[in-house]
Amino acid sequence: MTVAKKHWFQIAFQLRGSVIGAIYKRVICCALFGVLVTLLYQLKIPVSQPILGSVIPSIVLGLLLVFRTNTAYDRFWEGRKAWGSIVNNTRNLARQIWVSVEEVSLKDREAKISVLNLLVAFAVATKLHLRGEPINSELEDLISTSRYFKLKSMNNPPLEVAFWIGDYLQQQYTCKCLNSYQLTSIQELLNNLVDNLGSCERILRTPMPLAYSIHLKQLLLLYCFLLPFQMVESLGWWTGLVVGLVSFTLFGIEAIGLEIENPFGYDPNDLPLDAICNTMKRNIDDLTSLSPNVRSHDLGETSNVTI
């Protein structure tokens, strides 16, 4: 989901990203029912029943819809915060590893670049995992061939990637390329990444309670189909149009909640996970283009600290 600056009327009449496609059939159905009730009224059939307006108080239905939409937006915002945290933790982890891990040989530099690519692989694997997609070519350039095929067989690929990163950190500590304080600090960032993964999984696998969704839909249908009987005496042939407008409003609010409650897909209102992953890849590439300010034994490099 990307938001470009547009004129007010451009946004108002924009179809992409709106819920019109999801609700127009229900709206037309309600409007036609309003026309049918009007026709019956014109044929002197006593269908006008204004008292039906008290069957479902408007304020009750409004509160239910507001609660539904707010709950869905909370899920959307929690998902965005989790991915924002993934970005920040990835940047901090990459910086800490690049600067703190000492290099003894060229292989150490290559290993550091590989583990930094694993950080991007974690984000990509998380994206695919949340979308229920298999491991694909997006990861081929980020990890070795053996690890690529290993991930294909895993039930939770991002968790496996986090394990590989943790294994690398432990190896560097064993080789005395990291001290205990550095290891603890970096592992805390890695733990935060796994926590972010868990937050996203919680959003994905905790849908709205079924009973609430069923009852809200039943109330919406009752309200919209009882509406013509309340209005037909005063509105006449305008009843169908007004019922259509009211149902458009109510069904639209409910559809917005459905649209944003799972923010990890491909819909226009979902989070731009592809763009976020690409941003992290560019950040890592920029970082690895810099020389790490650490002690390097066999690389012919020394730390230059200017005070």
Curated annotation (Swiss-Prot):
Bilayer topology term: Multi-pass membrane protein
Primary location recorded for the protein, binned into one broad class: membrane
Membrane-traversing stretches: 19-39, 47-67, 209-229, 238-258
Family matches, as InterPro entries: Bestrophin-like, YneE/VCCN1/2-like
Matching Pfam families: Bestrophin
One term under GO cellular component: plasma membrane
Keyword terms: Cell membrane, Ion transport, Membrane, Transmembrane, Transmembrane helix, Transport
Location of this chain's protein in the cell: Cell membrane
One MF term in the entry's GO annotations: chloride channel activity
Family listed: Belongs to the anion channel-forming bestrophin (TC 1.A.46) family.
PANTHER family to which the protein is assigned, alphabetical: UPF0187 PROTEIN YNEE, VOLTAGE-DEPENDENT ANION CHANNEL-FORMING PROTEIN YNEE
Name of protein: Voltage-dependent anion channel-forming protein alr2987
Species assigned in the record: Nostoc sp. (strain PCC 7120 / SAG 25.82 / UTEX 2576)
